[in-house]
Amino acid sequence: MIYLDNAATTIKKPDAVYDAVLDAMKHCGNSGRGASDASLDASRKIYEARMCLTEFFGGDDAARLVFTANATEALNIAIHGLFEPGEHVITTQLEHNSVLRPLYMQRERGVGVDIVPCSDVGIKRGIISPSDIEALIRPDTKAIVCTHASNLTGNVVDIKSIGQIARKHNLLFIVDASQTAGVLPINIREMNIDVLCFTGHKGLMGPQGTGGLYVGERADIKPFKSGGTGVLSFLENQPMELPTRLEAGTLNGPGIAGLLTGVMELEKIGLDNIYAKEHELMQAFIEKIKTIPGIRIYGDFDMLPDKGLHCAIVSVNIADMDSAEVSDILMNEYGIATRSGIHCAPLMHKFFGTQNQGMVRFSFSYYNTVDEINEAAEALMQIAALR
């Protein structure tokens, strides 16, 4: 199988990640739940992971690095824990349902929600302008919630400029880094990010079931869940100290061990090298498919010759063929794994007018090869010729 669905999850990871997960499953106990060697080993590994990820993202305090099952849980913790009725939040048309649905729930509670539309004039590329976000700020605005990159088009958002706008107006800035963590440099301090939400199983090369959020000092998040913590057990309420405040229940120790190893392996390779390789594969793919009769490529790729930032995601359609049909042919006849449909990004499909057709998404990893990209392009050519 040629696996080109890395925006959903990476399958090929450094071998050391698999080894770390297995070793933790064999030898680590439950962190914070005893004084046995096994429990202490788990606690040490999780602490090491907090330290590593805090440094990786430019944070100041490892206690503010909270582990979750994925970015969806991290975003729910942030969105449901920060806002009260009567407050106002700004988000964008690019967002995944992991941002939109929690915000819609908050809207039902009386939180105002404004969605910044794409600013394209003429050809639709799916671009968000920071100035359009600033224009929607009101006296009751509390936060801006924004993705770092679209999971549908790969377009990268200028979060540094948005962070400056948020800080200028004394707003909280919450960033969904699901597609960029482990691919693009992220610095919480330099980008004025108050809450960074990330998943472990994509660019960070960790296992599924891992993720987290870094909670800045300005963000006072109410606990999303409560329960066992291993400390202060006579308290009726969840302890207020981070990370315990937001980490009720047993953590995914083996997964976190794998995530730690994934990040350490990324640092050995270097983010610049990872981005350059993925960018090269994406650009080669676009060059090969852009002249296919009936092909439509979605996103802002005009910057590619100048090496502008863009995640290695290419979403396409072939004339009026249903995206699910194209993806099914790619898998069953060519052994190429892609993702079809709406990709949990309904507002972007409304923007592009593809609500019914969906799109076929190709997403590349550092571990993909030029030969695989060539085979995928050739398969699209053959499918287009038969329509």
Features from the language model and the residues they span:
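Pyridoxal 5′-phosphate
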Residues: 1-387
